[in-house]
């Protein structure tokens, strides 16, 4: 009976809060990620021979009675020296862990970093707090420089279509507006990103205003029974915060002797008889020449079918490897920034292609793809797409005029397997730019 009482007494004494438990110096971080005002209490690992003074925690007192009785004889000077060294080591580790945790909490803060100025500090701040703020300010300054350099490197890495070409980092830095009324103008100084104005069917046919850049994205849908051979292409205008506005959809007609694409502003009905039918793209037998038409009727005299563009790809009969060479002929622009009406269906006048073959350039504008530069380091052709194109493709191109090769009228390139970017400016409209991009998708027997 006495033995059982003794064991119960010992178990109760060991479980009492006065006994010191072992601790591994873990710091409990709050789940919310916010600062915690509570401080961790650290205990000494192993049997305790000394206790700390309640007035001064750093002062070590002998484990004796309050009356000052001498310590137990088992405590030798050697044990005392070892315990003193262990206590000093534990205190240093605790200070180090506390300092590391404070830096980790600083890194988790999302508030903006402000420069610490000496004249704004209150006189009540002690010298210790001032000294502790200086390394924090240096740490934030280093973090700011690191973030800025990392952002710059990311921009440089995305400046070329696939790899950095060492070109200008500012998009269209020296571009001048072709056809401006005063003959001058900077492509970036007063340039803004375009938005949809009015109805979609009217907007896609209207030439882009001068000084406005339209950033678009083309997605290719190859899902379904026959989408592998006849995919559907969707054109969206990119807006802020990842938003996008649908503009046009296009698909290749199945029963056609040559490549024939239907373009509509109604994504649910991509047929020629649909209300949203905007025009079509038709190629020759070899796929080297494409003509873009609007939604007019070639048999009608009141609203005849108009020519919007002609795209010509240079033939590559010998099969030399390299980028495509393309020529784009557009109708000229009037003084009020409207297209000159040219119709190949009208027997009284010549079409765009006929005018170009006869070198009659009065009412047409000729564009060419910008010649890419060969990079010996990457063993590839590179162009500066200013971060808008991220993957190499034979379809990537930029359209420029010979009089001003720095003014990018249109650029097109791949960002993923079925996603492409398409940016265009004056004098193109969305219908013309989308049709030019569709011609790049089409297979070309004599150009590959």
From Swiss-Prot:
Taxonomic superkingdom: Eukaryota
Residues spanning the membrane: none
Main location as per UniProt: cytoplasm
Bias (Low complexity): 118-133
Biased composition (Gly residues): 182-191
Topology within the bilayer: Peripheral membrane protein
SUPFAM superfamilies: Tubby C-terminal domain-like (SSF54518)
Location of region: Disordered: 103-195
Compartments in which it is found: Cytoplasm; Nucleus; Cell projection, Cilium membrane; Cell projection, Rhabdomere
InterPro entries: Tubby-like_C, Tubby_C, Tubby_C_CS
GO biological-process terms attached to the record: protein localization to cilium
PROSITE patterns per record: TUB_1, TUB_2
GO cellular component, one term: ciliary membrane
Record PTM Phosphoserine, positions in chain: 141
Alphabetized UniProt keyword annotations: Cell membrane, Cell projection, Cytoplasm, Membrane, Nucleus, Phosphoprotein
Entries under PANTHER family matching the protein: PROTEIN KING TUBBY, TUBBY-RELATED
Family: Belongs to the TUB family.
Identification of the protein by name: Protein king tubby
Lineage: Eukaryota, Metazoa, Ecdysozoa, Arthropoda, Hexapoda
UniProt gene name: king-tubby
């Amino acid at each position: 009976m006495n033995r059982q009482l003794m064991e119960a007494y010992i178990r109760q004494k060991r479980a009492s809060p006065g006994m010191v438990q072992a601790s591994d110096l873990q710091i409990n971080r709050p789940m919310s990620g916010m600062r915690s005002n509570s401080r961790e209490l650290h205990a000494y690992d192993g049997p305790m021979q000394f206790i700390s003074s309640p007035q001064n925690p750093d002062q070590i007192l002998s484990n004796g009675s309050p009356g000052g009785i001498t310590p137990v004889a088992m405590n030798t000077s050697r044990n005392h020296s070892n315990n003193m060294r262990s206590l000093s080591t534990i205190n240093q580790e605790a200070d180090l862990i506390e300092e590391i945790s404070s830096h980790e909490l600083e890194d988790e803060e999302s508030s903006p970093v402000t420069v610490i100025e000496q004249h704004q500090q209150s006189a009540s701040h002690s010298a210790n707090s001032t000294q502790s703020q200086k390394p924090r300010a240096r740490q934030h300054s280093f973090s700011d420089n690191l973030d800025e350099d990392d952002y710059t490197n990311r921009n440089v890495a995305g400046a070329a279509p696939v790899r950095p070409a060492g070109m200008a980092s500012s998009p269209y830095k020296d571009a001048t507006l072709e056809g401006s009324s005063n003959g001058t103008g900077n492509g970036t100084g007063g340039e803004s990103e375009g938005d949809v104005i009015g109805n979609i069917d009217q907007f896609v046919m209207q030439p882009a205003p001068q000084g406005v850049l339209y950033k678009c994205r083309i997605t290719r849908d190859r899902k379904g029974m026959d989408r592998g051979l006849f995919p559907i292409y969707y054109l969206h205008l990119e807006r802020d915060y990842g938003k996008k506005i649908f503009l046009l959809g296009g698909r290749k007609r199945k029963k056609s002797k040559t490549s024939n694409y239907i373009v509509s502003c109604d994504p649910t009905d991509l047929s020629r008889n649909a209300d949203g039918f905007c025009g079509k793209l038709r190629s020759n037998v070899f796929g080297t020449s494409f003509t873009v038409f609007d939604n007019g009727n070639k048999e009608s005299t009141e609203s005849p079918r108009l020519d919007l563009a002609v795209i010509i790809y240079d033939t590559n009969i010998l099969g030399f490897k390299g980028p495509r060479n393309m020529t784009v002929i557009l109708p000229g622009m009037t003084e009020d920034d409207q297209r000159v009406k040219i119709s190949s269906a009208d027997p009284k006048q010549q079409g765009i292609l006929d005018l170009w073959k006869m070198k009659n350039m009065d009412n047409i504008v000729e564009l060419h793809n910008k010649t890419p530069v060969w990079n010996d380091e990457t063993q590839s052709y590179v162009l500066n797409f200013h971060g808008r194109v991220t993957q190499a493709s034979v379809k990537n191109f930029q359209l420029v005029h010979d009089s001003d090769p720095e003014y990018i009228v249109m650029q097109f390139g791949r960002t993923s397997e079925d996603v492409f970017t398409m940016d265009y400016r004056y004098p193109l409209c969305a219908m013309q730019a989308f049709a030019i991009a569709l011609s790049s998708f089409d297979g070309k027997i004599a150009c590959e």
